[in-house]
Amino acid sequence: MATGKIQTKFGDIEIEFFADAAPKTVENFVKLSKSGFYDGLAFHRIVPGFVIQGGDPNTKSAANRSKWGTGGPGWTVKAEFNKNKHSRGALSMARSQDPNSAGSQFFIVLKDSNFLDGQYTVFGRVTAGMDAVDKIAALKCDSADAPVDADQARMVKVTAS
C-alpha cells in the first residue's frame, strides 16, 4: 500500500493512496514528492468548510502571490475519475476547466462534497492528522482565500512511497 506524509507546523498529515483507482495520479504525486517539488510550498487556497489546496510552485515566494493557483510541474496527468467519494479527508487533484489539466495542485476535503464526485480525481485519503488540516483551514485568509501569513500554511516536507 502506498502512503505519504505532509509535514506542517501543526503536525503531520498522513495519507493512504488509492493506487488501484488512480495509478497515474498516485505515480505523479509520489514522483513529485520524492523530487522535493512540494517541500516548502504553501496551502494557498483555504475555503473553510470546503477544502485546503496546495501544490503550486509559485507559493515558494510571497513575491509571486498574484500568481498563486496558476503553477504546476510543466506537465499534466489525465483524469482518473473513480468510485471514491469526496468525503471529509479525501485527497483529490485540482485542475482547470479541462478535466485532463491536473499537474501538481491537490486539495484535501474538509466536509463531504459529493458534488465533486466524478469531476475530480480522488487519489487518496487522510488517515491521521485531520487536526492539522483543520488548523490550516482556520488560518486567517485574504479575499482571494489565500492565507495572510503563508508561512503558517507551509508544507515543510512531503514524502511518499
Region spans (language model):
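Cyclophilin-like peptidyl-prolyl cis-trans isomerases
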Residues: 1-161
